[in-house]
């Protein structure tokens, strides 16, 4: 059986997922798309999804598909995911699951009422080979984790990028993947601002340092530096009782040229995690064929949203340690 996939939102990531489903992965075909900008939908169909029909709304795409991908503007995600759940259709939602934690909570409640998982959230780092290997090393070799030192650096960001986006657009990936890496929950968050880079702009305090504490007492520091200039650079070091382990660098050819030994640093986040997108979507398609969902859940999206909201509040009170309070995990997500 070939799954009929509908895509809601055919901007850069939606179109790339359409290409991935039709040309790289197995078991599915993109058969319906929609976008608020019809030109985007037409370009997607012409470029990578020639068999897809262009429909006028998310609801039409959901009705015409076996499973859907929500790749639209973040503020639209909640309503579109809820519509997919109501229709009983497996749904892959790019982050954020919802722009506010209470919206993500409504999605969790709707899925609970349905009685089975239908939502996978697009936290692709869980599928990255480096993170998977690091998690196994942490689990089997380091002893109990004590600390994590992490960094999320971008070469530059556009002028519309503002201080809170460092949390909701950037740190959100670390919030999820470090929780998954440790199999632990956050209990507090703190934000501090070092000296600002001259490469920032009005409305953006850059860099930032976010300090998190987990229920098991692990201390985490995450540097967010989105105007670092030199490249897209993701770092993660776990310090355990018996030793340390680092996230491996992306594969690149080291050279010895002109009396210099070195290797290139990637500039684009899409190149850094390109393989993990393939793995996460194949995981979604496999589960969707059984009428369910796998991978990062709506609960994971909800926890990330709660934590991000607290971190954003901490930006307004630099240095203050704020509690992260989570409700009990529902049995559906045990």
Swiss-Prot record:
Gene3D superfamilies: Dihydrodipicolinate Reductase, domain 2, NAD(P)-binding Rossmann-like Domain. InterPro entries: Gfo-Idh-MocA_inositol_DH, Gfo/Idh/MocA-like_OxRdtase_C, Gfo/Idh/MocA-like_OxRdtase_N, MI/DCI_dehydrogenase, NAD(P)-bd_dom_sf. Keywords: NAD, Oxidoreductase. The keyword Oxidoreductase applies. GO terms for biological process: inositol catabolic process. It catalyses: myo-inositol + NAD(+) = scyllo-inosose + NADH + H(+). Coiled coil: none annotated. GO terms for molecular function: inositol 2-dehydrogenase (NAD+) activity; nucleotide binding. It comes from the Bacteria. Its EC number is 1.1.1.18. The keyword Acetylation does not apply. Pfam families: GFO_IDH_MocA (PF01408), GFO_IDH_MocA_C (PF02894). It is an enzyme of class 1 (oxidoreductase). Involved in the oxidation of myo-inositol (MI) to 2-keto-myo-inositol (2KMI or 2-inosose). Belongs to the Gfo/Idh/MocA family. PANTHER family: INOSITOL 2-DEHYDROGENASE, PTHR43593. Homotetramer. This is Inositol 2-dehydrogenase. The gene is iolG.
């Amino acid at each position: 059986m070939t799954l009929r996939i509908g895509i809601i939102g055919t901007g850069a990531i939606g179109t790339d997922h359409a290409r991935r489903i039709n040309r790289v992965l197995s078991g599915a075909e993109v058969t319906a798309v929609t976008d608020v900008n019809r030109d985007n939908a037409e370009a997607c169909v012409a470029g990578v999804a020639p068999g897809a029909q262009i429909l006028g709304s998310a609801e039409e795409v959901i009705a015409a598909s076996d499973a859907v991908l929500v790749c639209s503007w973040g503020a639209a995600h909640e309503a579109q995911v809820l519509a997919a759940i109501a229709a009983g259709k497996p749904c892959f939602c790019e982050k954020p699951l919802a722009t506010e934690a209470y919206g993500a909570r409504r999605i969790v409640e709707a899925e609970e009422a349905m009685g089975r998982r239908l939502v996978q959230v697009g936290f692709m780092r869980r599928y990255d080979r480096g993170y998977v290997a690091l998690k196994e090393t942490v689990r089997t070799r380091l002893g109990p984790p004590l600390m994590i030192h992490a960094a999320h650096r971008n070469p530059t960001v556009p002028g519309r990028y503002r201080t809170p986006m460092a949390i909701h657009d950037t740190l959100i990936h670390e919030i999820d993947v470090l929780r998954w890496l440790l199999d632990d929950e956050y209990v507090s968050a703190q934000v501090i601002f070092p000296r600002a880079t001259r490469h920032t702009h009005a409305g953006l305090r850059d860099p930032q340092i976010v300090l998190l504490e987990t229920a098991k007492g692990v201390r985490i520091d995450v540097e967010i530096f989105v105007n670092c200039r030199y490249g897209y650079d993701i770092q993660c070091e776990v310090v355990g009782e018996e030793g340390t382990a680092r996230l491996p660098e992306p594969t690149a050819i080291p050279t010895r040229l002109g009396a210099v030994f070195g290797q290139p640093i990637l500039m684009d986040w899409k190149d850094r995690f390109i393989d993990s997108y393939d793995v996460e979507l194949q995981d979604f398609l496999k589960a969707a064929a059984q009428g369910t969902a796998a991978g990062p859940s709506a609960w994971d999206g909800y926890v990330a949203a709660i934590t991000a909201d607290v971190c954003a509040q901490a930006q307004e009170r630099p240095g203050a340690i704020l509690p992260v309070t989570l409700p009990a995990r529902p049995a559906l997500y045990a």
